[in-house]
């Protein structure tokens, strides 16, 4: 299989695409990454719709999308256009179409772009199981072409562009039966429609591969880019994590998916889907886009590293086990969290540890490993005595100016872990190997940590360690280019079993949230990393950073330490107040560790995304809700005033409820 999906996994270069115009806005080519959003008003409400569009435009949104679910909605588009013209607005509009080709033919007259979902434009979702022969499959494609071609021809005639937007939650039965609920199915779903458009000489196309799970979403976009390379297609990509949710969790998921793909050079326009007021999506999208719009491409090529991943599927990078006391990492153990603390004196140190335990009780998390940041050598005795009162390992990060002399090496034997930079702490390689061997013989382990600029010097070291039988070693990197430098490290270690600790140093919690989600999160979804460690300079941030570490593991679906919510951002199809409903359900169920609950405004993606959730709460009509167990409806048309309680009863029935006092 050809694993190539971008220029290189080890450095930044944006994928070259054709330019697609959406009104006066240009997507792809050499243009900056475009920011867009979607309003959540009813499209028949002219005043409310225009108000939201203008608010988004003022906030910096460059393209606005709205749903057009029916002929009545399409009939109101001229009124919306007229009011926007009066207000002096020139922002391009996108009509979002599901299920209704006839409505698309009306909407295309009044917008700059049409979005169609290949999973439901010409198909109805029945979850039917059927084996298609090749001839039967071809007949289905002919049927789709007959339905889709009129819209393509009208778009071509009017100069209207199109997004072919696949959603993981709404693949057609035809695709599901042939390819399964997979990234490959998502890609092939889009390609079927692209081929039809190309047969009519229409190329003003943008493509998206959205999913609520960032891992699935990233794999699908990579596979799409790889297939584009094979087929010599150069369409721009619209990036987004659908149903990302709200608050920090929604921002983390979005940054993991969107940010890591932008790092790979994939993506020309982005939408951050939050279950919040649409204007709150724009600052997040701008932050992500500006990181790359301002990025300078380094002229030198990256050589000497080879692809060691399958970028289209998740497979954990295998490492040997590290075990000290009750602490276990690597091998098949969950990805662990290490917390960095300063040390002033024993009392303040132990108080900080107690604070972390107390904080963690509310979220079912607790400290797993502690690292003391650059203590002076004369503090080691006091640190050792304080650490003896704890059941978790306490390690020492040696400062840059500390020399690892024989006296210090002896003092460090009291610590299960020492972190050092071989290029700062040792001038003699033989002495370093002797130090590592002595610690291994004593049942201790060591972390070799250096800057990304020196990573080339790691080449050959894993072979040397393996030859002399040193195993109790893990590796980490200090870098602003976390994704690329850790991939380089992974390439160097690919034939060995040394664990990898993912380390990130950031100036403040906001930078930590976004940059760790992009860098560390982007590595975790590829199976790279046995421990994570996030560091900021201020002591007051420790609880927030402690929580962020676990939130990253939650966002990548590697460790669920709280309830996982899959909630859509709301649109004109939504059949209840999604923000209020999501907040209400969170207040009832937020303590259910590891339970996945989907809150969906309507049926467009609802049933499909239920497959990724334990329970679902989906709008079925005004004042009515369907409740799901997995992807199966178990309670239909539940009155909304009792739906929350019925959801709790459903969770209890299936044995996944916990009383708050027991958590």
From Swiss-Prot:
Q: Which UniProt keywords apply?
A: 4Fe-4S, Iron, Iron-sulfur, Isoprene biosynthesis, Metal-binding, Oxidoreductase
Protein name from the UniProt record? 4-hydroxy-3-methylbut-2-en-1-yl diphosphate synthase (flavodoxin)
Cofactor(s) needed for function: [4Fe-4S] cluster
Source species, domain of life: Bacteria
Documented EC number(s): 1.17.7.3
- What gene name does this entry carry? ispG
Give the function comment from the record: Converts 2C-methyl-D-erythritol 2,4-cyclodiphosphate (ME-2,4cPP) into 1-hydroxy-2-methyl-2-(E)-butenyl 4-diphosphate.
> Does Oxidoreductase appear among the keywords?
yes
**What biological processes does GO assign it?**
isopentenyl diphosphate biosynthetic process, methylerythritol 4-phosphate pathway; terpenoid biosynthetic process
